[in-house]
Amino acid sequence: MADTDDEHASPQNPDNRIELERQAADEAHKAKILAHPPEGPGGDPLHPPVTPRPGATRVVRDRKGGRRVVEVPSTGHSWDGIEEYDNPLPRWWLWTFYATIVWGVLYLIAYPAIPLVNGATQGLLGQNYRSDVAAEIQRFNEANAPIQAKLVETPLEEIAADPELANYTANAGAAIFRTWCAQCHGSGAGGATGYPSLLDNDWLWGGTLEEIHTTVMHGIRDPKDADTRYSEMPRFGIDGLLENAQISQVVNHVLELGGLPHDAALAAEGVEVFADNCSSCHAEDGTGDRAQGAPDLTDAVWLYGSDPATITRIVRDGPFGVMPAWTGRLSEADIVAVAAYVHSLGGGE
């Protein structure tokens, strides 16, 4: 047992030799400090102030598999007693880095990569992603051409009774809606301020499938479509059609029609103002007129808001919401599909 202990304590043992080399490096470092003590309070070389060490040690392997201790130089960067040493990067990391450089150069040569004025370099493989997308769209259109033709030829009122068409409009219409309509009406079709909800039965221009189809085709107040749905609420305040007192009166009357808190005296005075200026579109009882896109003022649905300040702004400034006409932007089959999808959301009549 004694021989075994001596063997482990021998300098010939690799682990023990490494430890001895570490100790020797530490002794050498301590000797450097004693030979050149840093300046500080008290001038005590054995207890100098905290200063960056000039170096550290680490164990490295040589090509023959042996290990040795080497000194690692410091970069000179130190903060709060923490030093940065100039250790070399791991070999695996370096080779990975070099491999990515080679891969990047090969990709630059093989694929479109360098932008030009009217395009980009095509690369040795001649890859063209735009052509790939166009081919995929063409393949999709060819695959769906039969059912799209059937959809266009089928009367609108018969689409829901055909399982194949009903399934197609539910899926294709939803995809079209998310792409072109959700930006205003919301991904769930719940609408937002100034953009009507498509989930309820409150429709400005009508909620039958035929009426929805017409609205999608021609839009609302789209100057580029001659058949667009059009109506315009006067700017009663900006154009001086009503005085501020009259606007306050008619606003309170509108609040009264909607069952909202209001000033009874002003509302009574606003009845005549409403009859003279608003009833031609909204009807004398405030229930609106779909032929003109005039909303019902007696229900709980408010496109822009139901607070007095918002209603005052609407009467004074006059809203002018616009929906684009989708004829020419979407195919006839796509328009039918999205109209049928909107009609099926729950509020269709």
From Swiss-Prot:
Q: Which UniProt keywords apply?
A: Cell inner membrane, Cell membrane, Electron transport, Heme, Hydrogen ion transport, Ion transport, Iron, Membrane, Metal-binding, Oxidoreductase, Repeat, Respiratory chain, Transmembrane, Transmembrane helix, Transport
The GO molecular function terms of this record are: electron transfer activity; heme binding; iron ion binding; oxidoreductase activity
Q: Where is this region: Disordered?
A: 1-67
Query: Where's the Cytochrome c domain?
Result: 168-258, 265-346
In Gene Ontology terms, what is a biological process of this protein?
A: oxidative phosphorylation
> What domain of life?
Bacteria
Membrane topology type, per the record? Answer: Single-pass membrane protein
- Entry-linked InterPro entries: CcoP_N (IPR032858), CcoP_N_sf (IPR038414), Cyt_c-like_dom (IPR009056), Cyt_c-like_dom_sf (IPR036909), Cyt_C_IC (IPR008168), Cyt_c_oxidase_cbb3_su3 (IPR004678), Cytochrome_c_Oxidase_Subunit (IPR050597)
User: Which residues are listed as membrane-spanning?
Assistant: 97-117
Keyword Nucleus (UniProt): no
Pathways per UniProt: Energy metabolism; oxidative phosphorylation
UniProt GO cellular component terms: plasma membrane
Cofactors, names only: heme c
UniProt keyword Electron transport present: yes
Function, as annotated, reads: C-type cytochrome. Part of the cbb3-type cytochrome c oxidase complex. CcoP subunit is required for transferring electrons from donor cytochrome c via its heme groups to CcoO subunit. From there, electrons are shuttled to the catalytic binuclear center of CcoN subunit where oxygen reduction takes place. The complex also functions as a proton pump.
Can you name this protein? Answer: Cbb3-type cytochrome c oxidase subunit CcoP
The source organism is Paracoccus denitrificans (strain Pd 1222)
